[in-house]
Amino acid sequence: MPALRLLNTESQDKADYLHNQLTTDINVPSTYWECAESYLKGVGIYDVFLIEEQDFRNYKIFLHETGSFTKKQVFERTGFLRNLQKALIRNEYKELLDEIERCNTVQERLKGNVRNFLIRQGIHHVREIDYRTRELYESELRRTKTFSKSLEYLKTLDRIKQFDIRKEMETLSGRNKEQLKYEGQVIFLPYIPDQDIGSDFDYIQDKSELVWDFSQKASENLKRQIFQILCYALRNIKDSKDRRVRYLLPLRWMYEFCIEEGIDDIERLELEQIKKLETIVARKVVNVKNSMQIVDNSRKILFMSGKEIHWYANVWYMERFNFAPERVNPSNPVQRLSFYEVTNERNRELLQEYMKYQVGISDLALGNIRSQLCYIKKFLVYFNTIESICEITEEQIAEYFKLLQEQEIKAETVNRQIFDIHRFFAYLNVKGHIKGQIFDQNYYSQKVYPYHHDRSVQEDEYMEILKKLKFFPEVQRLIFLNLWATGLRISEVCTLKGDAYYWDGEDAWIKVYQIKMKAEKMIPISLVLYRIMKIYIKKHHIKSTDFLFNSKDGGAYRIGTFVKGFKASCKKYGIYISGETFKTHDYRHTLASSFYDDGVSIRTIRDYLGHNNENMTKQYIDYMPKRIEQANMEYFNQTENLLATGIIPKKRGEKTGK
């Protein structure tokens, strides 16, 4: 019974609301509104605002069919209802009508349909339009209009909304709302505050890809992460095509994948999950590698923007840290340290704890830390099935080291791996994760025998390069000249500064920081090289603290960039490179061997190259073949040592006497 009374009350309220609307103008004859009230109640309309064009026509037919009214009376009564609706709309929706009227980016003939729809939805201002409103309008248009007309009216709604956003952004209050805020809402990209970006999406035909639903049931942390990455892409990726192909589309696929898989943290994506996502992406695009960049890009955005360092993340990005200069090689920087390859979570946590110590507390160079991480990861992956690496036995470790020693790996590399693994266990021991040392590294280390590098570049090869060097790009030319003429390491050449070259009044010198040795040295150079580099420095207005050769991001020129570019130039100009590939270090060997052939002592060459000991220098010098050849020539140039000495030529047919 109470429910019935409630229903009756609601019905009466609606009837009263309609009655009040119809009797707004007291000067209108009661017969006008009484007739209209009776008809509207009969067809279930209790709000004058909701009367549509077809309703007006049906009312006109109804009046004719009663036979009680003349044509004039029918016209007057339908006119009353139309005029009443217009008056109510002008009074109730004045702001909305004015806002639509001000929009000068759409055709006037298309505004009416949009306006009527918004009024039926009870929308009083254009700013109230959101994606849900657009969705309702699209649904209505599909039912009532042709496909082409639907697109036309939807586009009109979008233009009205975008015009209003632009106008609002011109105000102080609007500019304060310029940044998107996470509110667990549905975001339609053409409606974002920054319309310079929003208008980029006008060309997208499938508007569904522009809808980002942060109201759906999913991990709140995941939704906030996706929102943050989305905002980053909108703000920082200026090329609209690149933004769509490398960020927005793959990000949407990753978002859908994470919801389906119940993933709540992108920074903790597992290797198997990444592979599964890659399989899904492969069904959507041809260039899978390009789209899968979203995983690394997303992790980096989140890691770099955290208020605190996310040590729990499966990938650490080194840009997040401020390292002492001597720990970084600007020409070959360590970009990231990854841990997701270790799928045993407990072992990964221990590895991350150890790497946190190495990165944050030790003074090791990042290149050494990366190398160490690589060796330990390989070790942990091998023992992935062990619940915790802390439970490993020496017998199991011995088995692993035996496998290492059976591979075609240099003894010093094997020893390096054993040493790094030993340091990892030493850390676990100090931190109380294990009790005592599990193995003795000296027991498993291999004996290292001195060996010689035969890596000198043949003269005809580098002379051909020098002959055609004028055709190479400027930076490639100058880097090669420094490699060939000075014997510097490629990392040292790529990190030369504007004050590297100087004249002491008698000789030209180059000052270089040895990244590998963490020391500065000076060596003499040719006057020609000095002059060439001084001209380059002056031409490009390079300051004393600036890098001579810059990468795209303004840092030191990348080693990989040079090698790749130089190889391409050699191929372009038909230059043959011996060996499997172009190796910059070979020119260091070449210069050292050249010095030795000219009679320079091993000690002097050692100092020039910047080695700590002569044994390393000896490995660089290809002295044996040339020394043997020279001794051979000297020996056989002596008449008594000629092989032909004592041989008496015989005439044809003459017996030998045997």
What are these regions (language model features)?
Residues 32, 526-578:
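Active-site/catalytic core of tyrosine-dependent DNA strand-transfer enzymes
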Residues 1-427, 431, 481:
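Charge-rich, intrinsically disordered N-terminal extensions
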Residues 460-490, 588:
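Basic, Lys/Arg- and aromatic-enriched nucleic-acid-binding interface segment
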Residues 496-531, 658:
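Conserved tyrosine-mediated DNA breakage-rejoining catalytic core shared by Y-recombinases
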Residues 514-518, 609-637:
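Catalytic-site neighborhood detector that most strongly recognizes the C-terminal catalytic loop/helix
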Residues 553, 634-658:
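C-terminal secondary-structure termini that scaffold catalytic or DNA-interacting sites
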Residues 501-505, 580, 600-621, 648:
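Short, polar N-cap/turn motifs at the start of nucleic acid-interacting alpha helices
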